[in-house]
């Protein structure tokens, strides 16, 4: 078990296998030079493309939006055409392992999965844990609210089911997530990722209030409007981050 945890630590701190960074040619064509990406497209793309077409989504004009809910251990995939106003739900994928507790990541080595609004910073088609997408942590808010000097980093959505701060999926469904994000990146769009402690239902909100301290509940109250806005409008909320590290929503 100790050996497994040590390997997971290397994965979540980016010490195993550098991320892919070539820029020549189209992004997708460069990704397809890697065996795991090529295999993913060969075995799963036709089915995924059919799912997209059933939603009237064109892969050549697609944008992708990802939501992750820690308590529910779910990753949601939403898609839309660039010309569409609203996203449509595509599928839900189980997050197959977890670490830490509900609440944001505030320092290096706390084993926490971040919470907040991010993008995909980079793609790793040769990860030690199959395929990996680097979450854009720390963002401006995280850097301001850090507990100490070191935020930590290299938080990944990846294959396999071992983690101490990343978001692990099984190898088969991570192919779908990876391919969708490759397609979106190839369309010159950056998939947005929103990570929440849970879905902010009345029951869950009561659970958070009764079981966690004021600091966490104040943070959750700050990010909840993004969840609520998307639930109502099926488009992500516009936001900025102020000098105190708080999200400020402008919709």
Language model: regions and residue ranges:
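A structural boundary/capping signal
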Residues: 26-30, 61, 102-103, 219, ...
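Short Gly/aromatic-enriched secondary-structure transition segments
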Residues: 81-96
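Acidic helix-start/capping segments at beta-turn-to-alpha-helix junctions
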Residues: 92-100, 196-199
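Exported/periplasmic cell-wall-interacting domains
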Residues: 109-251
């Amino acid at each position: 078990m100790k050996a497994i945890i040590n390997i997971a630590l290397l994965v979540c701190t980016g010490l195993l296998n550098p991320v892919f960074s070539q820029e020549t040619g189209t992004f997708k064509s460069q990704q397809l030079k890697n065996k795991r990406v090529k295999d993913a497209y060969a075995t799963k793309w036709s089915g995924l493309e059919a799912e997209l077409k059933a939603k009237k989504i064109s892969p050549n004009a697609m944008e992708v939006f990802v939501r992750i809910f820690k308590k529910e251990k779910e990753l949601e995939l939403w898609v839309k055409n660039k010309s569409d106003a609203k996203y449509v739900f595509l599928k839900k994928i189980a997050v197959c392992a977890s670490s830490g507790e509900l609440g944001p990541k505030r320092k290096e080595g706390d084993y926490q999965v971040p919470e907040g609004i991010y993008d995909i910073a980079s793609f790793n088609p040769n990860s030690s844990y199959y395929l990996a997408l680097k979450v854009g942590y720390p963002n401006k808010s995280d850097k301001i609210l850090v507990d100490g000097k070191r935020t930590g980093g290299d938080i990944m959505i990846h294959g396999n089911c071992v983690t101490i701060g990343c978001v692990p999926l099984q190898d088969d469904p991570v192919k779908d997530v990876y391919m969708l994000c490759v397609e979106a990146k190839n369309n010159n769009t950056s998939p947005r990722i929103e990570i929440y402690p849970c879905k902010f239902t009345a029951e869950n909100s009561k659970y958070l209030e009764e079981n966690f301290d004021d600091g966490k509940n104040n943070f959750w109250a700050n990010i909840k409007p993004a969840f609520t806005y998307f639930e109502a409008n099926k488009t992500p909320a516009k936001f900025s981050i102020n000098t105190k590290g708080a999200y400020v929503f402008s919709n």
